[in-house]
């Protein structure tokens, strides 16, 4: 049976393969498995678990939120709804309110018809695989006895938790942004109101783009996966920096004054060097995923910074950071984790820390981005194949080995099944774009031939 949870929660087309019934069942199972330890959590010795619930702006978020809230309350959990909010705001609210766990409804950068469910454990941490598996197993079983009378959960709106998150973000900014002109692309998502508000409170001159909160247009030609309009706006508005978020604002990418993209690897490099300069980079180590560009590794090695590598997914980055006591980690895609201030990738926090570095150094972002030189990287998404056999195909293994031999020390190959979409990702880095592109296309053809979709 296909696993319900992917690398970042549950995702699917809302009302097709992510239904209200599933959302209610998942919420009930989560209370049963995560709720018991929280019944006595917090200074008030609560009689029932407390669960924080937030969502992005997608139209389907309303009925899925209603289903989740119903499942939680019917299973005996109190619910604190914070409404439309970034994913990291839910994680922060769980920790700040000493909640038992939290639920975020979002499909991140996916198109509008999709939606998803992310669950945060006590303290605001994403669930480990074994807990997600336990929730899936419980969902497959008949429902147990439900509370009655005064034992059912209560539901209340708690917008103040979002205000506490905004205050927390501003407290993590080391300097004011008074002289910076910033364009922020909110992707019509969860940060549409909050990101411009926080940046203005920090002193920046803000031009908000795709920030109406129109969930029907979430991620449509905007945000971290569609940077063209942001690049144009930065140049047209003579801005210093452009900031892009995705639908749930757990990611941040940037654009410099010339309209050039600054990706997650470059942001990490800038922040790692800044922390190291201040003696605040624990063990002089940064944590990244296997997708990180070789140029990042080269730059960190030259700076005397150790790089720890994990599988794709910011929760794996966080797990490695917590295990090693590290404070900075992230992904090329723009998930950046400042573990002293957050428990998950936080796009707004990342934007503030990046802009703070621009402000405190007085250097343009384009100059700071020279902290690393990216090797040409080509990513090909191969659809319509059996992604479950990526690691077991002899034909594919042979093709990868041959490509790696050709590239030598000047490049690398990575093939992996997506954890959030039905496809296989082929990534190649090389010393020239032409070599990377040719190698990636040849490997993609082998993937199509070796991994035909099951009939």
Swiss-Prot record:
This is Phosphoglucosamine mutase. It comes from Frankia alni (strain DSM 45986 / CECT 9034 / ACN14a). Pfam families: PGM_PMM_I (PF02878), PGM_PMM_II (PF02879), PGM_PMM_III (PF02880), PGM_PMM_IV (PF00408). Binds 1 Mg(2+) ion per subunit. Belongs to the phosphohexose mutase family. Its EC number is 5.4.2.10. Activated by phosphorylation. Keywords: Isomerase, Magnesium, Metal-binding, Phosphoprotein. SUPFAM superfamilies: Phosphoglucomutase, C-terminal domain, Phosphoglucomutase, first 3 domains. GO terms for molecular function: magnesium ion binding; phosphoglucosamine mutase activity; phosphomannomutase activity. It catalyses: alpha-D-glucosamine 1-phosphate = D-glucosamine 6-phosphate. It comes from the Bacteria. Transmembrane segments: none annotated. Catalyzes the conversion of glucosamine-6-phosphate to glucosamine-1-phosphate. The active site is at 108 (phosphoserine intermediate). InterPro entries: A-D-PHexomutase_a/b/a-I, A-D-PHexomutase_a/b/a-I/II/III, A-D-PHexomutase_a/b/a-II, A-D-PHexomutase_a/b/a-III, A-D-PHexomutase_C, A-D-PHexomutase_C_sf, A-D-PHexomutase_CS, Alpha-D-phosphohexomutase_SF. The modification Phosphoserine is found at residue 108. The keyword Amino-acid biosynthesis does not apply. CDD domains: GlmM. Mg(2+) binds at residues 108, 246, 248, 250.
């Amino acid at each position: 049976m296909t696993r319900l949870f992917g690398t970042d929660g549950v995702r699917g087309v809302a009302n097709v393969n992510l239904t209200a019934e599933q959302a209610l069942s998942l919420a009930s199972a989560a209370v049963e498995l995560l709720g018991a330890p929280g019944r006595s959590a917090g200074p008030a010795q609560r009689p029932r678990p407390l669960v924080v619930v937030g969502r992005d702006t997608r139209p389907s978020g309303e009925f899925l939120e209603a289903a989740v809230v119903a499942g939680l309350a019917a299973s005996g959990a109190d619910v604190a709804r914070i409404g439309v909010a970034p994913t990291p705001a839910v994680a922060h609210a769980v920790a700040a309110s000493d909640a038992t766990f939290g639920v975020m409804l979002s499909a991140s950068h996916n198109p509008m018809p999709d939606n998803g469910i992310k669950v945060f454990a006590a303290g605001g941490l994403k669930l480990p695989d074994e807990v997600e598996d336990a929730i899936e197993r419980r969902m497959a079983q008949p429902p147990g006895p439900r509370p009655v009378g005064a034992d059912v959960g209560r539901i209340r709106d708690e917008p103040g938790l979002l205000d506490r998150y905004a205050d927390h973000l501003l407290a993590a900014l080391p300097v004011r942004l008074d002289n910076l002109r910033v364009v922020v692309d909110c992707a019509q998502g969860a940060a549409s109101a909050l990101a411009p508000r926080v940046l203005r409170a920090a002193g920046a001159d803000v031009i908000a783009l795709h920030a109406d909160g129109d969930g029907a247009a979430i991620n449509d030609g905007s945000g971290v996966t569609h940077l063209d309009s942001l690049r144009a706006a930065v140049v047209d508005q003579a801005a210093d920096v452009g900031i892009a978020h995705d639908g749930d604002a757990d990611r941040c990418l940037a654009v410099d004054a010339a309209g050039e993209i600054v990706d997650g690897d470059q942001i990490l490099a800038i922040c790692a060097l800044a922390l190291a300069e201040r003696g605040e980079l624990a063990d002089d180590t940064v944590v990244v995923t296997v997708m990180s560009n070789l140029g990042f590794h080269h730059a960190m090695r030259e700076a005397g910074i150790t790089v720890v590598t994990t599988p794709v997914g910011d929760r794996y980055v966080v797990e490695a950071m917590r295990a090693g006591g590290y404070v900075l980690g992230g992904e090329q895609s723009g998930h950046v984790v400042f573990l002293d201030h957050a428990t998950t990738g936080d796009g707004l926090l990342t934007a503030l820390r990046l802009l703070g570095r621009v402000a405190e150094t007085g250097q343009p972002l384009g100059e700071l981005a020279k902290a690393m030189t990216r090797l040409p990287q080509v990513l090909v998404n191969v659809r319509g194949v059996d992604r479950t056999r990526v690691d077991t195909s002899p034909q594919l293994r042979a093709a990868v080995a041959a490509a790696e031999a050709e590239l030598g020390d000047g490049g690398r190959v990575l093939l992996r099944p997506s954890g959030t979409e039905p496809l296989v990702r082929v990534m190649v880095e090389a010393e020239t774009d032409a070599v990377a592109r040719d190698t990636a296309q040849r490997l993609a053809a082998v993937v199509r031939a070796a991994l035909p979709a099951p009939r």
